[in-house]
From Swiss-Prot:
The keyword Cytoplasm applies. GTP binds at residues 22-29, 90-94, 144-147. The gene is prfC. One of its GO terms (biological process) is translational termination. Increases the formation of ribosomal termination complexes and stimulates activities of RF-1 and RF-2. It binds guanine nucleotides and has strong preference for UGA stop codons. It may interact directly with the ribosome. The stimulation of RF-1 and RF-2 is significantly reduced by GTP and GDP, but not by GMP. HAMAP family: Rel_fac_3 (MF_00072). This is Peptide chain release factor 3.
Length: 531
């Protein structure tokens, strides 16, 4: 273990690695932009809605995202903030892209939950919070869009507490909303920060009024709003939870901030809280033991593979979360699944689509390894030790289509493209044992569009979909070899191999699946599979 004075300890302790979770349109991409702006990582924050201009948001860089204005793939951005170095993992905001998002949440130590204050808790936020629950991830909450008419702030906090089962501790409190939005009162600092709208890359000077009873406050926001603020705060402070860092770190309590990302207001208050309270890199469970971030030997795992980040290079990048130790250019690593030593000299770090060669990186950082088809999601890299990090899920798809070619001569390219897209988690592919069909499985409809669009632009293959009689899929395994062979013989017409050659049962109806499970109780039918 390390003494807390070593340079390595200093580097690791200033890392904060987090992801943003929200319902589509709650303002997540705008928040991402503004977080980077306050971290001085970009000078011009491009808003996604500016369709006509070339200024697409920095974190949305794939062609299809540029057209639709939604974040379809996870990007990684690193920037300094105060004394910390922040790694922000941007997750797909569109409701369909849950698998990629779920896996990204395995690579972070905390999350920022963005809620549209006009709408409250929405469906996608509920689902993502369930995933963060699996690892008790600490959550910071940002109530967004205060420059619009919003719901009652007390109601919003009650809804978060009741629906998401997490206690709320307000850190800032809004003064008015919509056209009447005047700013926030910072409960911990006992000061009012007045709102002046900043747009794009303008960070406005803040006017601060010290103390809740300061007569300046009445002059600045008007006597009525000032009186309302004092009244609300008396209620709020009596009824809500005090901030407790231990409960926050256990994922049981969330600090709540109010603001408007579009107006560049409140994002810095939230960042101050996040960098102060969120944990530095956390220990991680491997099958063999728990790995601490303070260990000096390198370990890391692949949580995502992204093809063709750079159309000029036609490359694929494996995103590795470093769990412990230091990556140094040119170092040797053990690719555990293959039992192979590899020399890594060209890992990259990210500023959303802008890649820089990494000289070194530390626990908590994300690096990109060039991948020529040998790296898969869930792979572990170490400095020699044989370890397998656990908890990186694959989910059974909920939607299925048969895919076929307009030009039958391109079957080879189609298969290659589909296998690569399935390795990076964009889609799942099933090849039935009894015919030459290719069945594509997805968690959401938009994934199908993405696959066709990427097959065309990256593999020059024109594919079309047809309906297919598949309701669900389950991965199957059995400890009794003899019984498994018998099961395979009897169910040949329902079996398929996925992109990684794992056997799956393809059920035309849920009734069929239930019957198959009843008839073969010794066979395990799994809805998720560890990578």
């Amino acid at each position: 273990m390390l003494m807390s004075t070593t340079p390595y300890f200093g580097e690791v302790s200033k890392r904060r690695t987090f992801a943003i979770i929200s319902h589509p349109d709650a303002g997540k991409t705008t928040i991402t932009e503004k977080v980077l702006l306050f971290g001085r990582a970009i000078q011009v924050a491009g808003t996604v809605k500016g369709r006509g201009s070339n200024q697409h948001a920095k974190s949305d860089w794939m062609e299809m995202e540029k057209e639709r204005g939604i974040s379809v793939t996870t990007s990684v951005m690193q920037f300094p903030y105060g004394d910390c170095l922040v790694n922000l993992l941007d997750t797909p905001g569109h409701e369909d892209f849950s698998e990629d998002t779920y896996r990204t949440l395995t690579a972070v130590d905390s999350c920022l939950m963005v809620i549209d204050a006009a709408k409250g808790v929405e469906d996608r936020t509920r689902k993502l919070m369930e995933v963060t629950r699996l690892r008790d991830t600490p959550i910071v909450t940002f109530m967004n869009k205060l420059d619009r008419e919003i719901r009652d702030p007390m109601e919003l906090m009650d809804e978060v507490e009741n629906e998401l089962k997490i206690a709320c501790s307000p850190i800032t409190w809004p003064i008015g909303c919509g056209k009447e939005f005047k700013g926030v009162y910072h409960i911990h600092r006992d000061e009012t920060i007045l709102y002046t709208s900043g747009q794009g890359h303008t960070i406005q000077e803040e006017r601060i009024i010290k103390g809740l009873d300061n007569p300046e406050l009445d002059q600045a926001v008007g006597a009525d709003l000032a009186a309302q603020l004092r009244e609300e705060l008396e209620l709020v402070l009596g009824a809500s939870h005090e901030f407790d860092r231990e409960l926050f770190l256990q994922g049981e309590l969330t600090p709540v901030f109010f603001g408007t990302a579009l107006g560049n207001f409140g994002v810095d208050h939230m960042l101050d809280g996040l960098t102060q309270w969120a944990p530095s890199p956390m220990p991680r469970q491997a099958a063999e033991r728990v790995v601490e971030a303070s260990e000096e030997k390198f370990t890391g795992f692949v949580f995502k593979i992204q093809a063709n980040m750079d159309p000029k290079h036609r490359d694929r990048i494996a995103f590795v979360r470093i769990v412990s130790g230091t990556y140094k250019q040119g170092m040797k690593m053990n690719h555990v699944r293959l039992g192979k030593q590899v020399n890594i000299s060209d890992a990259v770090t990210f500023m959303a689509g802008d890649r820089a060669r990494a000289e070194e990186a530390f626990a908590g950082d994300i690096i990109g390894l060039h991948n020529h088809g040998t790296i898969q999601i869930g792979d572990t890299f170490t400095q020699g030790e044989t370890l397998k990090f656990t908890g990186i899920p694959n989910f059974a798809p909920e939607l299925f289509r048969r895919i076929r070619l307009r030009d039958p001569l391109k079957q080879k390219q189609l298969l290659k493209g589909l296998v690569q897209l399935s390795e990076e988690g964009a889609v799942q592919v099933f090849r039935p044992l009894q015919n030459n069909d290719l069945i594509v499985g997805a968690v959401g409809v938009l994934q199908f569009d993405v696959v066709v669009s990427r097959l065309k632009s990256e593999y020059n293959v024109e594919a079309i979909y047809e309906g297919v009689n598949v309701a669900t899929a389950r991965w199957v395994e059995c400890d009794d070899v003899k019984k498994f062979e018998e099961f395979k013989r009897k169910n040949q017409s329902n079996l398929a191999l996925d992109g990684g050659d794992n056997l799956a049962y393809i059920a035309p109806t849920m009734v069929n699946l239930n019957l198959a499970q009843e008839r073969s109780p010794e066979v395990k039918f799994r809805a998720t599979r560890e990578h």
